[in-house]
């Protein structure tokens, strides 16, 4: 399943790359977290965006959700992922892939609890013009 998600993300990214020559830059997603748009293409009412996200040791994404589905591949490091119940819903090591569903009912947090940068390749499939993420309040967890 993980290989299938990675193949889908890579295939979609290659298709998007073939369809566009523009390269956009993104701003950091939060304290210590950086993001760089590698490829962006709009088809119909959807934006397909391939982005590299780097999370330094001890940092995280902050609580958030997405307006569209995301497919991520862990290029480096280990990502610890938590849902709104404060439970870990996955620990993703280098070479792993994950899917994040859309909607405010899927609030989550990604953290780097390791000693090296986490580097993700993320394919965002968003409604046209939607932001990468929507900030959400801490759902009552003892960590941020």
Language-model features: where?
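Short acidic-glycine-tyrosine-enriched beta hairpin
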Residues: 43-45, 55-57, 79, 83-105
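Short, conserved beta-strand element in jelly-roll/cupin
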Residues: 67-81
């Amino acid at each position: 399943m993980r290989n299938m998600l990675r193949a889908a993300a890579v295939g979609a990214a290659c298709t998007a790359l073939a369809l566009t020559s523009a390269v956009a830059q993104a701003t950091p997603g939060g304290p210590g977290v950086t993001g760089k748009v590698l490829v962006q293409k709009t088809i119909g009412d959807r934006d397909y965006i391939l982005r590299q996200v780097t999370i330094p040791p001890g940092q995280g994404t902050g609580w958030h959700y997405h307006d569209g589905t995301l497919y991520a591949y862990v290029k480096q490091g280990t990502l610890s992922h938590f849902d709104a119940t404060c439970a870990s819903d996955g620990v993703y090591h280098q070479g792993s892939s994950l899917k994040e569903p859309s909607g405010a009912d899927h609030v989550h947090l990604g953290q780097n609890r390791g000693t090296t940068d986490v580097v993700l390749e993320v394919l965002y499939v968003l409604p046209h013009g939607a932001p990468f993420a929507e900030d959400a309040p801490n759902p009552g967890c003892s960590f941020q």
